[in-house]
């Protein structure tokens, strides 16, 4: 071993308190033991008074001038056993050790740093049978919890932060393992000249773990100087003294996609590039690729720090371009994809059935007499009778026209399509067989309410189970909630959402017709009385007002009949369809399931209930994939092919008259062949 080649020195210190045993001279050692992997440092533990140990200088150099100095010198590495750190060094010993400090008094003098000299250690420490001696303080006086807590919370002793200069060729050594075994030069006063440690860490070196576990000191206030490697020294230094700060407000400069991301500038404080990465074993295989027998290797995705910051900017720009592209596409609104027999105008605000526009004639019959009244009757009545009559007539005309527009051009309560899609018909189903859909009677749980059960039906066109009181209109080709009837004068269905407007329209039209008759007759009679003329001369003077009297009387009859009829239906709690269908059954089997048992309550329920929202929202922007609507715009939809679903609401072109033989195909072909032969 290296310990046998070194010069002979004093092997053991003076034993004062019989703490350290006596060891034979080094020359007596003939056989050297193997290198010790764990350096025993329990002999470095000092006493509380600093005088319980040896006071004889070790090695006899300049240390003889300072008898109180115990282990403050660095000696050659041959006087200590080879560890995993010192065994790697091939440096020769110095002729004379250099003292770190000239004086050390008090309790500080009783501590021997782990970076200090090993020349005072017994020669038997290099043998295989060496057992480190324990002081009485370390063995019989264990550390209490308060001392342990104080030791953990205390700062590093000055011996750890003491700067030093490595002279000679030892000054270029950067290894954590070999730094402790090098020669330390003269002490300097500034911390700025401290050499940075190597790239090793506390958890990646085997010797570091041994030194941390074997060099614990039980004495309060003292710390083993080499229990922790030099890689943590920058962590123990004050932050302000070294001006260490982190800049978090830096922006990344824009780079081209082909430029690789820049790596941070390497400094002496940087970790190595392979930090915490698997090492290679003897066979050259990394730990991540080694064979694991009986285990399962889990796959993991790449970590986010590997993604350069520019990729996030590119992704955000890509999303913006996609959003702009979608906006440019302009998918349109819901009414453009509606599949019903409905026509829309003004961006989906007005809708009407795609049939003969009889509602235009109805509106004309309302607006035309109002215009004639304001031209030929209102000025004279304003000045000769009262201004209240024209104002009241204008208010009634406004209510009538407004309710007409709402009832004719609003959504009556169209139910959404494709809510309960029916499976497609199988090929083996017979087209002449019984229907697969029919009226279904939903039975209630209690037998006492059997009379109030109502049937519901599945609509094959709209592909949904219709709720009670809902029906499919064959003209609108829509299922309407609480449908009353399809009004040809409005060219729209009357359902739950526009029934109140319909009743207001017919009732206001009735009142407006009566008011028109009364105002025009009053104008003629007042003029006759003012001028004392006959009724014929007055009619000859106001011919247009007299014509409006007849027009008002004619237009009064039909709206008045509709008003009385719907007042009767509302009092019964029935719709027009329910009332007409009930006459198919005898009176003993007619039931009104939705009546409130009071005609006032029935009126209140119909006229004062809130208007439900629309199920479609035709003015809303279209979302691609909405199952209620089609996949193409109405004018871009392909032609409907003939199928087993029927021919409802499809335009069928008239068939041309066929000439020639209309028999079977075989006979037709044979007939054509014979005709060709005859012609030949």
UniProtKB/Swiss-Prot annotation:
Keywords tagged on the record: Acyltransferase, Endoplasmic reticulum, Lipoprotein, Membrane, Palmitate, Transferase, Transmembrane, Transmembrane helix
Reaction catalyzed: L-cysteinyl-[protein] + hexadecanoyl-CoA = S-hexadecanoyl-L-cysteinyl-[protein] + CoA
Modifications after synthesis and translation: Autopalmitoylated.
Cell compartment(s), UniProt: Endoplasmic reticulum membrane
Domain commentary: The DHHC domain is required for palmitoyltransferase activity.
Extent of Polar residues compositional bias: 9-21, 63-89, 667-680
Residues of the active site: 487
Family, per entry: Belongs to the DHHC palmitoyltransferase family. ERF2/ZDHHC9 subfamily.
Its EC number(s): 2.3.1.225
Enzyme class: transferase
MF GO annotations: protein-cysteine S-palmitoyltransferase activity
Transmembrane segments: 362-382, 385-405, 502-522, 544-564
Mode of membrane association: Multi-pass membrane protein
Function text: Palmitoyltransferase specific for Ras proteins.
Bias (Low complexity): 106-128, 264-275
Name this polypeptide is given: Palmitoyltransferase erf2
Lumenal topological domain residue ranges: 383-384, 523-543
GO CC aspect terms: endoplasmic reticulum; endoplasmic reticulum membrane; Golgi apparatus
Region annotation (Disordered) ranges: 1-128, 246-315, 656-680
Species lineage: Eukaryota, Fungi, Dikarya, Ascomycota, Pezizomycotina
Domain of life from the UniProt record: Eukaryota
Keyword Ubl conjugation in annotation: no
